Regions:
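N-terminal Rossmann-fold NAD(P) dinucleotide-binding loop
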Residues: 161-162
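An N-terminal-biased, well-structured beta-alpha scaffold segment characteristic
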Residues: 1-95, 202, 224
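Short beta->alpha connector loops at strand-helix junctions that form conserved
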Residues: 75-76, 93-100, 197, 241
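Glycine-rich Rossmann-fold phosphate-binding loop(s) that bind the pyrophosphate
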Residues: 157-158
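Rossmann-like dinucleotide-binding domain for NAD(H)/NADP(H)
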Residues: 234-236, 240-332
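Phosphate-binding beta-alpha-beta segment of Rossmann-like dinucleotide-binding domains, i.e.
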Residues: 92-151
């Protein structure tokens, strides 16, 4: 069995399979053959033999060159929705790695919450300006908050959202959530679940709003001036979903005017962010370069999940994190 993989050529260390990891994989696959796929390359050998594809960069042109393709496993939570028509037509199975990021992303969200609420991020600015003293810190003292027993709205109560909710619940926080499917049973640690169409009402009065939404026709620019103006003045907005769900011009305005207290942004519309971006000048904003899911044991988890599914695939059993076609059409 041939397995095509595009995870060898990334210039970023945590996004590629290194030699040590590859040796572990080869020991596991035994009789199967894994071949490197470079999507940008026109001519490649053995694509017509590939039955399983493992990676993030598969596209419609590649699928056309792989007539025997039966299963695609994305090494990410996001899915390339441009391949929707082809995989539906050919009935190709699609899985992703949504559960691998929950601990890392929830840790990032908590770091945003504590840094912005306690003003520790601001101390880095004071340090750079050689003003690291109580007198200068006093300028933001009115925005300093006690995290415990505050309220949080989690917009997207999936695998990652539930992990965040559980951690915040342990801090005594009041948990509210947005869930696309309103027919779910409410977890005991969540006080109330809203439908997405009630988002404006849901953000009102919450201390923290955490966005986990993917970009779809219904969510593009959903966080705009109307939503930001519905938030309480000392609220903190956190985005670890997708940059395209936020109208960045509107967000920039409310942050400049201190209409909300601050923001923690791991994702932007354009990545990497331009060093000329006005967001970088704001002291009430923390920006990270889309690294919320990074962790030093990622590949151990990734390999474990892929090979568990490979065993299931060979046994013709149900695959973990199998996506339905409606999810794929939306890109998640």
């Amino acid at each position: 069995m041939y397995i095509g993989c595009d995870l060898f050529s990334s210039s970023i260390k945590f996004q590629r399979i290194d030699k040590l990891t590859l040796s572990k994989i080869k020991k596991k696959i035994k009789s199967d053959k894994i071949i490197e796929v470079i999507p940008e390359k026109r001519e490649q050998k053995n694509l017509d033999k590939v039955e399983i594809y493992w990676g993030n960069r598969i596209n419609s042109n590649l699928i056309k060159k792989m007539p025997n393709l039966k299963w695609i496993h994305f090494a990410s939570t996001g899915i390339n929705k441009d391949i929707y028509e082809q995989i539906k037509k050919k009935k190709i199975k699609v899985t992703n790695t949504q559960n691998l990021y929950s601990s890392a992303v929830s840790s990032t969200v908590l770091s945003f919450i504590f840094s912005l609420a306690r003003g520790t991020h601001y101390c880095n600015f004071l340090r750079a300006e050689k003003k690291l003293n109580r007198f200068h810190f006093d300028k933001i003292s009115n925005s300093i908050q006690d995290v415990y027993f505050q309220s949080i709205l989690i917009v997207g109560l999936g695998e990652i959202g539930n992990k965040i909710a559980k951690v915040c619940n342990s801090l005594g926080m009041e948990i509210f959530a947005i869930k696309k499917k309103s027919v779910m049973k409410k977890p005991k640690y969540v006080k109330k679940i809203f439908q997405l169409k009630k988002l404006k009402k849901a953000v009102s009065g919450k201390d923290y709003i955490v966005n986990l939404l993917p970009v779809t026709n219904n969510t593009k620019n959903i966080f705009n001036k109307n939503l930001f103006n519905s938030m309480k003045k000392n609220s903190i907005f956190i985005n670890v979903g997708r940059g395209g769900t936020v109208n960045e011009r509107d967000l920039l305005k409310v942050l400049k005017k201190n209409r909300i207290s601050g923001a923690g942004l791991d994702v932007m519309v354009n990545e990497p962010i331009s060093m000329k971006s006005s967001f970088l000048k704001l002291k009430n904003v923390i920006i990270t370069p889309h690294i919320a899911g990074v962790t030093n044991n990622f590949w151990d988890k990734q390999i474990s999940l892929f090979f568990e599914n490979l065993i299931r695939y060979k046994r013709n059993s149900n695959l973990q994190y199998l996506k339905n076609f409606s999810n794929i059409k939306e890109g998640y």
